[in-house]
Design a protein with these regions (language model features):
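Short, solvent-exposed amphipathic alpha-helices that sit
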Residues: 56-72, 156-160, 186-209, 228, ...
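Hydrophobic alpha-helical
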Residues: 100-124, 195, 214-280
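Flexible loop/hinge segments that line or gate small-molecule binding clefts
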Residues: 118-155, 166, 175, 179-181, ...
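Bacterial N-terminal signal peptides
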Residues: 22-34
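Extracytoplasmic "Venus flytrap"
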Residues: 44-64, 68-72, 77-94, 100, ...
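Short beta-strand elements in bilobed, periplasmic/extracellular small-molecule ligand-binding domains
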Residues: 71-83, 177-178, 199-221
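Hinge/cleft segment of the Venus flytrap/periplasmic-binding protein
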Residues: 41, 179-183, 187, 199-202, ...
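Hydrophobic alpha-helical segments within soluble ligand-binding/sensing domains
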Residues: 90, 148-175, 225, 273-277, ...
Length: 342
């Protein structure tokens, strides 16, 4: 909301003249604000994502989106899929949205090819397209969206790999499991690549250490993650660490706690500060987490769509970061997490 400031009136202007000037300025400001409000009221923005409503991370993105739409007076709709990571359902949602011709479409481009057709249709209809949370890594989709707002996944994964590796035991063999939660999807593959980069640095720095790295399809359903990683731990009780590409390692933390495994015996690291993760960090079961500020990923695309329509500014890329969070920081973050803003 814009708040008009009192205009500066030179002291030499008389009272009556000052009142006239103030009235004129106030009238002009009212006129500008009325135009802005009218323009904002007509702004129609839709966010389609690849997540289901059960995905707690995405509730923070939605909150940012809703808050931004309220601030600029836009009509906003946030569209989830029924099954987490379902590209087919996301494409269907996008096609339905594009047919209605909103002013802007915000979406997560988890695949480099699946969305080309619907994005071309959106461009032909003059719809502003901004990718958020996940971007295409190659191909025509990059030219069909105007900006990306989200995390740079490979560097973020590398950071996680290096930071958790710094906690590995100083002696003895190292056995690591990397969970790729959605094989083939950009966010999971790029983060996993980054984690592998970080682990390779550890191996090069410790050429005399025996380092074993395994990868599995860990999935995104918490129960499935628990079952698959749990089965792996049964077969490999010497596992040093588990890396997750989302927040789904919270299921592994709970599993370890239920099995009475001491905190820190199996090191855990992943992404996103959902409340369950923070609780397990505080309990000592998760050692390193990488934040990507989901509230910002919902909020900023709306602002960019608003600025394009009402000011003529082109949308711009925004890196929402890769902040490293450790258990000693949990208390200071917990309040924002409970509000859904972190």
């Amino acid at each position: 909301m814009l708040i008009p400031c009192s205009p500066y009136i030179p002291r030499r202007i008389g009272t009556r003249a000052a009142l006239i000037v103030r009235s004129a300025v106030a009238l002009a400001l009212s006129f500008v604000l009325a135009i802005s409000a009218s323009a904002a009221d007509s702004l129609n923005i839709v966010f389609t994502c690849h997540a289901a409503t059960t995905n707690s991370f995405w509730q923070a993105v939605k909150l940012g989106f809703d808050d931004a739409c309220t601030r600029v007076g836009a009509k906003g709709q946030f569209s989830f899929v029924q099954k987490d990571s379902s590209i087919e359902q996301q494409v269907a949602n996008m096609e339905a949205v594009v047919a209605r011709k909103p002013d802007a479409l915000i979406t997560s481009l988890v695949d480099n090819n699946a969305f080309v057709g619907v994005l071309k249709d959106a461009k032909e209809k003059g719809i502003t397209v901004i990718s958020s949370n996940v971007d295409a890594t190659a191909g025509p989709e990059l030219a069909l969206r105007e900006a990306f707002i989200g995390q740079n996944f490979i560097p973020a994964g590398t950071t996680l790999g290096k930071r958790l590796a710094a906690l590995f035991p100083k002696e003895g063999p190292i056995h690591v499991l990397v969970g790729v939660n959605a094989p083939g999807q950009n966010w999971a593959e790029q983060r996993a690549q980054g984690v592998m980069n970080g682990l390779e640095e550890f191996k090069k720095a410790n050429p005399d250490r025996q380092v074993t790295i395994d990868k599995i399809d860990a999935r995104t359903e918490l129960a499935v993650v628990s079952d698959r990683v749990g089965a792996y731990l049964n077969a490999h009780p010497d596992t040093t660490a588990y890396f997750d590409m989302g927040y789904f390692h919270v299921a592994v933390a709970k599993l370890l706690k239920d099995r009475n495994v001491p905190p820190g015996k199996v090191l855990l690291g992943g992404f996103d500060l959902v409340p369950q993760v923070l609780e397990m960090m505080k309990a000592g079961y998760i050692q390193v987490e990488i934040d990507q500020q989901p509230y910002m990923q919902g909020f900023m695309p709306v602002m960019e769509a608003y600025l394009k329509k009402n000011v003529g500014l082109a949308p711009a890329n925004i890196d929402t970061g890769e902040a490293v969070i450790t258990p000693d920081q949990v208390d200071s973050i917990m309040a924002l997490s409970k509000e859904g803003k972190r």
